[in-house]
Amino acid sequence: MAKQIQAIRGMNDILPTQSPLWQKLETVLRDTVGSYGYSEIRTPIVESTDLFKRSIGEVTDIVEKEMYTFEDRNGDSLTLRPEGTASTVRAGNEHGLLYNQEQRLWYMGPMFRHERPQKGRYRQFHQFGVEVYGIPTADIDAEVLMLSAKLWEKLGITEHVTLELNTLGDTEERAAYRDALIAFLEQHKEVLDEDSQRRMYSNPLRVLDSKNADVQALLADAPVLMDYFGEDTRSHFSHLCELLEAVGIQYTINPRLVRGLDYYNRTVFEWVTSSLGSQGTVLAGGRYDGLVGQLGGKPTPAVGFAMGLERIVLLLQTLELDKDIGPAVDVYVTAMGDNCKVEAIKIAQELRASLPTAKVMSHCGGGNFKKQMKRADKSGACVALVIGEDELANNQVAVKHLREDKAQELVARDALATYIAELI
């Protein structure tokens, strides 16, 4: 026997028993962004490697360690997309969607990072993101946060997530702070771990995000970014906080929150949970006003967020919010004998036409009554419809209840759709 081929490590199948929860989550996401007037954009999974080097930053974990990069047959360097924002900006620039325009966009699809697989973190993962272009004011920052809060409300997890906020200031403010932070770190270089020493000059703000306990203890005495902000940055952040308070969204200001991508400025945020252990961030984003220009477009203000769907699915399962999902099949249609098979198929088709949301499965492959009932039960259907010679002669259908202790019923064929509609 040939050796069985397995899925690649960190890239998982979503099986039929798991897909209803995914479908429920995806429906909530689509319906919510639709209610805010956002439009979907779909971009290729494979992009030029240079796109991510220029957007994410060459001295980041993603570009240095995690990207799936390869040369195609023309010798061009290509990369499986590790995130969605850069591709969205590239598409916006390429198709003239961004200059002097406002765009509210969303995307959903697979992303790829060569990380160590662990609970809630995979090498292929599915990301949902929101991107807004052309609006520089704090009210749109508040809107994307309100939208994210609405997602938690619809998923029933509002009580299990908290919002952390920070502002990174503009380019000049960060440059002044960067110099002060480097000077401080140079004085305490012996305390820094290897990762922080490497980042000290190339990307010093990422040192603030270090998980090393000694580094975090040192940073308690480090310069504070907010001390370097001018009036515009302070006013923008203050207005955002006022708007969130006005709509009842609670938040915590976290001055160490810097995000892992180079393109962020001003507002940054994360929604975090304590229900998933170390993988606590479930949604993250912020403002990236320089990215469109950085990728060849005209300077355009932008703000957005992204969330990993695997982590949301894991959270829903952890909180046992994955139980209230309807069956994969509502009605299973059986036929007793070859003479009844055609009518059984027609009845199934009539039900699908009359009840578009009903999930109707026809038995295929033959078999006696016992075998068909076994298949019906295994399908998860709440009822099985039995079409035999007697039922056919009387223009009736026998309804066998599979999940309730009820006697079998005979229903007139012309009343069947109404009966099933009330049942499911």
UniProtKB/Swiss-Prot annotation:
| Enzyme class name | ligase
What's one GO-annotated cellular component? cytoplasm
Query: Which Gene Ontology molecular function entries are recorded, alphabetically?
Result: ATP binding; histidine-tRNA ligase activity
One Pfam family of this chain: HGTP_anticodon
Q: What is its main location?
A: cytoplasm
Catalysis: reaction(s): tRNA(His) + L-histidine + ATP = L-histidyl-tRNA(His) + AMP + diphosphate + H(+)
Q: Does the keyword Cytoplasm apply?
A: yes
Q: Where in the cell is it found?
A: Cytoplasm
- Which UniProt keywords are listed? Aminoacyl-tRNA synthetase, ATP-binding, Cytoplasm, Ligase, Nucleotide-binding, Protein biosynthesis
EC number(s) recorded for this UniProt protein: 6.1.1.21
User: Could you provide one GO biological process annotation from this protein's UniProt record?
Assistant: histidyl-tRNA aminoacylation
Q: Does the keyword Nucleotide-binding apply?
A: yes
Give the NCBIfam families listed for this entry.
hisS
**Family, per entry:** Belongs to the class-II aminoacyl-tRNA synthetase family.
Q: How does it assemble?
A: Homodimer.
Its protein name is Histidine--tRNA ligase
Q: Source species, please?
A: Shewanella pealeana (strain ATCC 700345 / ANG-SQ1)
Gene, per the UniProt record: hisS
